[in-house]
Amino acid sequence: MLNLIADQAWNPFAPFGVTSWEPFVANLIAFILMVVILRYLAFKPIQNVLEKRRQRIEEGEEMREESERQLASVKEQTHEMLVEAGEKGQEKIDAAKAAAARLLEEQEAEASRKAEEIIKKARQLAELEQQKEREALKEQFGQLVALAAAQVTGKMLTEEDQRRINREAIDSLDS
């Protein structure tokens, strides 16, 4: 009886059903080893994969924001170039009108006919120049949109993809 009381007094885990300390220590060591093994073989690789994924997502967001900034810049440049082309066309029209007025004073009938031809040619030239500027800007815009799409998606675009993106970008500019 004394041995039983002495064993219980010495073993603080007896109320929990642990009567011998050897299995408890063995289980504790096995648990600690399992935690260490899982940490290095499972948790660390999973954490590394999650960290790499988070970094890729951040890089993708940065590229998207940069693409949006570039797109806004291209739109602004396109608008400025169109305004400039319109001003140049208007200057040419104004110059043609002034030339027509001088010719009108010198030769009434023939000057009138020549002035109309000059005005018509100036308008056609202005429209042609403006159209060329628009086409060049559309092509440049399409290329930048394709480049931005390639950066955002992170893959090389095929020629068909680039043509489709160019068409969509040009259609969005026209509307």
UniProtKB/Swiss-Prot annotation:
InterPro entries linked to this entry: ATP_synth_b/b'su_bac/chlpt, ATP_synthase_B_chain
Localization: Cell inner membrane
One Gene Ontology CC term in the entry: proton-transporting ATP synthase complex
Pfam family, one: ATP-synt_B
Transmembrane segments: 18-38
GO-annotated molecular function: proton-transporting ATP synthase activity, rotational mechanism; proton-transporting ATPase activity, rotational mechanism
Family of the protein in this entry: Belongs to the ATPase B chain family.
Known function: F(1)F(0) ATP synthase produces ATP from ADP in the presence of a proton or sodium gradient. F-type ATPases consist of two structural domains, F(1) containing the extramembraneous catalytic core and F(0) containing the membrane proton channel, linked together by a central stalk and a peripheral stalk. During catalysis, ATP synthesis in the catalytic domain of F(1) is coupled via a rotary mechanism of the central stalk subunits to proton translocation.
Protein name, UniProt field: ATP synthase subunit b
Gene from which this protein is expressed: atpF
